[in-house]
Amino acid sequence: MSKIIFIHKKNNKQEYNKYSERILRAAPKTLCIDKVNREFIEESIDTADYLFINETRGEIRGFATVYHDNFDGKHIHISLICNSTTSNIITRKGVPTLGGKALIESILAYGKKIKVKDVRLDAIKEVIPYYYKLGFTFENSHYNKDKEEELIKQLRKAYLNNSNTEFKQILRKIVVKFYSGYFKEKFQHDMGKNDDERVVYAMDRGIPMKFVFKPQSICKGKSIKQPNKCAKHKTCKVVNGRKRSYCRKTKNTRKKYNI
């Protein structure tokens, strides 16, 4: 049977070390398919706060290293995710094994549980459309969602057509459109100053993407201790009762008695 194992390094150091050793024995060739060197895997494990492991009948099929990143707010960052290609097969007993998507979903579920603002990762160029399909978006894309979708479609088409020149041109458009200011702020010491150098850097390190959790509305008609928090939201209004104050949606015109 397949399952996703979650290990918090601070709370379970012994278990974390045990699985880390198992991952290092198998990861470079089997799990990461020779696409990630051993040094980077070791660094990702050492600096991570959590391990997410895809295990099938006692065998590790994939893993993800995740750490807390306090840059620009509270969020968690996936530093590395590897999953064996054999994870897509059906076992002899007819039980399908879990793939990389299950790892992502487990990480998102944990991020939502601990109430982070978003989950981030650096997507290598080949998988940008895949992560977009899972709900990850570019930085500053909320200003132009239509353009983001258009560029993603173009990027996927160029990749499927093996058009490397066109692929780089589209990637350059993405960097210029969504990441010019972002890269200047976060990586100004590591990368060049012009757009071409930023594209090379992005292709090497990956394009930063994030899955943003929608903030839960407080306009639920429940009593509140701090009315000012409700008043800050344009879609909310404060209703004062005899003993309590309530936060409602502005569209709610129904009178509430005995308050």
Regions found by a protein language model. Give the residues of each.
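Extracellular Cys-Trp
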Residues: 216-257
